[in-house]
């Protein structure tokens, strides 16, 4: 069981593949070129059980129509479907805080605060994903903060958007307010991890770093200081594979 980072970042788009030992794949977002997704899953498109879509923005949805044309089911919120202008096809609305099955995986969506460039609220889901081979993985991206606490659930893996460092924000950039109200800062990321850290946590993958307001070395160092040596902390990069096995065999 592993996760492969197919694409990550504010400009390159975001897509991550969870793959079980049987070859079954679930995609987290599909925000890059369809051909890149195909390469990222070794062209095993028939093994994809579905896509968990967080929100409507292009860096998370670029390939959604091609994914649907391939007969793959996309799961997301009803508002996101409406805002994407999709009226038919292999897309299903899922309800917040309600478990559903996606192949041998299960998932439950929860709302996260996000904004669009026009400063309007943007419906956005994070997902708690479970599989017998990996335990519990939490995926959350493009959020200013998260009001939910997951400590009692004893997460095993965390894939979290760590977009920017406060001191690197360019307030002369007209989009700077969207960046801080629609994305997670390093300090917020650290606080979330502190609040939800247990001995069960095995891996943290930091994703969706800003191209001009992030410092990967600083982020890696400070997150490692929070969790210690028993948790594998990595910066997501295209092609990275993260071992998600719950057991060492």
Predicted regions located by residue number:
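Metallo-beta-lactamase
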Residues: 76-134
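Short, polar loop motifs at secondary-structure junctions
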Residues: 33, 77-83, 95-97, 143-145, ...
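Divalent metal-coordination and catalytic microenvironments
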Residues: 18, 29, 55, 107, ...
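Cap/insert and terminal regions of metallo-dependent hydrolase folds
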Residues: 148-237
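Conserved catalytic scaffold of divalent metal-dependent phosphoesterases
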Residues: 98, 104-114, 131-135, 143-145, ...
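Conserved beta-strand hairpin/beta-sheet module of binuclear metal-dependent hydrolase folds
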Residues: 1-43, 123-142, 157
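Active-site environment of divalent metal-dependent phosphoester hydrolases
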Residues: 57-61, 81-83, 116-118, 145-148, ...
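Active-site metal-binding motif and surrounding structural segment of the metallo-beta-lactamase
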Residues: 33-79
């Amino acid at each position: 069981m592993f996760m492969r980072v197919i694409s990550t970042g504010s400009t390159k788009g975001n897509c991550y593949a969870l793959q079980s030992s049987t070859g079954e794949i679930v995609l987290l977002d599909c925000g890059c070129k369809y051909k890149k997704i195909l390469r990222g899953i070794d062209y095993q498109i028939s093994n994809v059980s579905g896509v968990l879509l967080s929100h409507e923005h292009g860096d998370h949805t670029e390939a959604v129509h091609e994914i649907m044309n391939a007969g793959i089911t996309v799961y997301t919120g009803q508002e996101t479907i409406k805002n994407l202008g999709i009226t038919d096809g292999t897309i299903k609305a899922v309800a917040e805080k309600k478990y559903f099955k996606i192949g041998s995986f299960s998932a439950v969506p929860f709302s996260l605060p996000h904004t669009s460039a026009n400063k309007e609220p943007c419906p956005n889901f994070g997902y708690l994903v479970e599989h017998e081979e990996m335990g519990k993985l939490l995926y959350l991206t493009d959020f200013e903060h998260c009001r939910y606490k997951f400590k009692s659930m004893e997460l095993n893996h965390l894939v979290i958007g760590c977009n920017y460092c406060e001191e690197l924000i360019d307030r002369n950039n007209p989009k700077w307010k969207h960046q801080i109200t629609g994305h997670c800062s390093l300090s917020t990321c650290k606080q979330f991890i502190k609040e939800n850290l247990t001995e069960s946590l095995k891996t943290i993958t930091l994703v969706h770093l800003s191209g001009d307001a992030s410092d990967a070395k600083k982020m890696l160092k400070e997150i490692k200081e929070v969790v210690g040596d028993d948790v594998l902390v990595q910066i997501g990069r295209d092609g990275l594979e993260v071992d998600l096995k719950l057991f060492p065999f």
